[in-house]
A protein has these predicted regions:
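Intrinsic disorder in cytosolic terminal tails and internal cytosolic loops
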Residues: 1-6, 188, 448-470
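Interfacial helix-cap and linker-helix signal at transmembrane-aqueous boundaries
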Residues: 34-35, 65-66, 150-158, 213, ...
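Transmembrane-helix bundle of Major Facilitator Superfamily
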Residues: 1-180, 316-317, 323-324, 328-330, ...
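Membrane-interface "helix-start" segments
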Residues: 190-202
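C-terminal membrane-cytosol helix-exit motif in multi-pass small-molecule transporters
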Residues: 168-187, 203-215, 233-248, 441-449
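12-transmembrane solute porter fold
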Residues: 9-29, 45-50, 138, 197, ...
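Membrane-interface helix caps and helix-loop-helix hairpins in membrane proteins
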Residues: 95, 159-161, 186-192, 216-222, ...
Length: 470
């Protein structure tokens, strides 16, 4: 019965993560109809940015809350908030309302990937856990790629509102699965005291930072008042946050985690890999269509081997970690991603679909060798009481790196275009920037402790506060 309930939990986690991942991209093909229906063209980009902002900012918060209050109740709370945001987004009567409801949706979505990965980390042993997290990474990638297609189909054959309503029946199934199959063991000790001051300072600081990054990407400069102002606010808020966290009995982000070499190396490597990865996903299709003259369909096809490589190597990376340790695996992954960007920087107008597919596959293999091994190594290193916070921080830094990387690469492209260079030359500058970032990530990967399979296996023998049961 326990195995059956464990499978139900995994199904509920995968289903909810699929919905959250798809929602990050599903609106892209629906937005022309949304603008025609609601107006607000001048602020429509915040339909995307608002979701990204709240989902990113809340990742560490959700992770820590799950450590303090229990995985089940916090995960269900986040899932319900996500579904409420979905329902209200479908009912929106103005662009301003839609943006607000999308931010509510993102608030819930921030919990789903972070706590979902944490639940998997507690339910399974090392090798099985890595395989399951590989599957979840695959679910995320497939859902993100399917989003625009699903959005287009729903918009054409039903209504743009159904890109939000579609979450409700499937989300209800996920709620039922998690609610009935997952049980939190009682937390011993006194009632936890929530770090409200740290929560406010962290939210304000990271929100201001992301607003500055998003604005810099939009205007292609980092010197405007609309960028510098939020950056100053972010610096002040985060400085206060560091002071508050050092004194808080139950900090929302336990700074002591960064004294652990594995956590620090994984956070920095994930941040840099995220900068490069999100840039590739965003600018590769643009190059293929605008410079090489491929169709939108062909450009989309090129991203498929990227996802397949990521999924395949995520699943098999556990065996590699068990045999040779995680530093070698992570370094090999970053070298593959570096090779992919080196090949991207050599693209030309005569690029063939086969070569583009090859390079995307190499990049996907690199990400698969990097992300899941770092996550399972961190989960096997930290105390069980910090598992949610540590898992969330790794994913937070990867997402934050992606947002900053997109902005930097967008600025590079705009600055090169302003010099009169062709779009192809401008995009070459973007890929060279990604190559430099990858080289820095390789150096960061060497900071990952060598590790041995025996060490991971011993670290995996911990008490288990999350279980399956009736």
């Amino acid at each position: 019965m326990a195995d059956r309930r464990r499978r139900l939990v995994v199904l509920g986690v995968m289903l909810s993560i699929f919905l959250a991942a798809m929602e990050s991209t599903v609106v892209s093909t629906a937005m022309p109809r949304v603008v025609a229906s609601l107006g607000g063209l001048e602020i429509y980009s915040w339909v995307f940015s608002g979701f990204l902002l709240t989902s990113t900012v809340t990742m560490p918060i959700w992770g820590r809350l799950s450590d303090l209050l229990g995985r089940r109740r916090v995960y269900l709370g986040g899932l319900v908030i996500f579904l409420l945001g979905s329902a209200l987004s479908g009912l929106a009567q103005s662009m301003t309302q839609l943006i607000g409801f999308r931010m509510l949706q993102g608030l819930g979505a921030g919990s789903l990937m972070t706590i979902g990965m944490t639940i998997i980390g507690e339910l399974f042993g090392l090798e099985k856990r890595a395989k399951m997290q590989g599957y979840i990474s695959g679910v995320w990638g497939v859902a993100s790629l399917c989003g625009p297609l699903v959005g287009g189909l729903l918009t054409d054959h039903a209504s743009w509102r159904w890109v939000f309503y579609i979450n409700l029946p499937f989300g209800a199934v996920a709620v039922a699965l998690i609610a009935t199959a997952l049980v939190d063991s009682p937390r011993a000790g006194r009632r936890p005291v929530l770090d409200y001051a740290g929560l406010v300072c962290f939210t304000a600081g990271i929100s201001a930072l992301l607003i500055a990054v998003l604005e810099a990407g939009r205007v292609a400069t980092w010197t405007g008042l609309d960028v510098v102002g939020p950056l100053v606010l972010a610096a002040v808020a985060l400085a206060v946050f560091l002071v508050v966290e050092r004194r808080a009995p139950e900090p929302i982000v336990p700074l002591r985690l960064f004294a652990i070499r594995m956590v620090l190396a994984a956070a920095s490597t994930g941040f840099l890999a995220g900068m490069a990865m999100f840039g590739a996903i965003s600018f590769v299709p643009l190059y293929l269509q605008s410079v090489s003259g491929m169709s939108a369909t062909a450009a989309g096809v090129v991203l498929i081997p990227f996802v397949l490589g990521w999924v395949a190597m995520s699943i098999t990376s556990a065996r590699l970690v068990l045999r040779i340790g995680y530093r070698i695996v992570v370094v090999a992954g970053m070298l593959c991603l570096t090779l992919a960007f080196l090949l991207l920087s050599r693209w030309s107008e005569s690029l063939t679909l086969g070569l583009a597919t090859r390079d995307a596959l190499i990049g996907g293999v690199g990400m698969g060798l990097t992300m899941v091994p770092m996550l399972i190594a961190v989960q096997s290193t930290v105390a069980r009481s910090d598992l949610g916070a540590a898992t969330a921080m790794i994913q937070f830094f990867r997402t934050l790196g992606g947002a900053i990387g997109l902005s930097i690469m967008g600025t590079v492209m705009a600055s090169r275009l302003s010099l009169g260079l062709s779009q192809g030359d401008a995009l070459h500058g973007v890929f060279v920037t990604g190559l430099v970032i990858c080289l820095a990530a390789v150096a960061s990967a060497f900071l990952v402790p060598a590790g041995r399979a025996q060490d991971l296996a011993r670290a995996d023998l911990r008490s288990e506060p999350t279980r399956v049961g009736g």
